[in-house]
Amino acid sequence: MKHFTAFLMSVLLTGPAFAAPATAPAPLPGDSVYQLAATLTDQDGHTAPWAARRGTPQIVSMFYASCTMVCPMIIDTMKATRRAAGEPAALGLLAVSFDPARDNTDALRRYAAAHRLDLRWWTLAHATPADTRSLAALLGVQYRPLPDGDFNHSSVLLLLDADGRIVARSTIIGRTDPAFVAAVRQLAGAQP
């Protein structure tokens, strides 16, 4: 028994030296939007780097929670697109606010509840004003505040692959874009 205990101790103490080294994630592709060093805070108050979205394809857009016209249509179009694509499990839905002054964690949580967003797939997020501007520029979303607190803004849905490359873009809001849905199906079908 002494020999077995000594043998077991030597294996336990030297085993880590022979273990396979942990592999670092592959570098991001040069055209990945995750190259941007921004931080997002979600509707549950969790803060993470923008690049933490890596690993799962995403439909991404920008909005603001107090919008009563176009932004609900953006959210509904994202929902409808996911449904039309067969509700793939390997697909995240991310809407980032460009009104960080008002769209805090509580406002985003209330918005998610009011719009019945399934938080298994959905993330509503806000960032610092500087990160919001950088993210909007990167995604090609234009916005400007109006004196009454509303915003003029463009409306776009982007499909990102797991590494953050833009695979498809759609400006069709209020109904599904067949080409965009096809791109979602193709990308989500390619995932393990």
Which positions does each model-derived feature cover?
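Soluble extramembrane regions of membrane proteins in the secretory/endomembrane system
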Residues: 28, 111, 115, 121-125, ...
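Positively charged n-region of N-terminal signal peptides that target proteins for export
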Residues: 1-4
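Short active-site neighborhood of thiol/selenol oxidoreductases, capturing the structured segment around
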Residues: 50-78
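N-proximal helix/coil linker or "cap" segments that precede and/or mark the start of modular domains
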Residues: 18-36
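A short beta-strand-turn-helix
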Residues: 38-58, 82
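Structural microenvironment flanking redox-active thiols in thiol-disulfide oxidoreductases
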Residues: 73-135
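Thiol-/selenol-based redox modules, centered on thioredoxin-like
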Residues: 146-192
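Bacterial N-terminal signal peptides
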Residues: 6-16
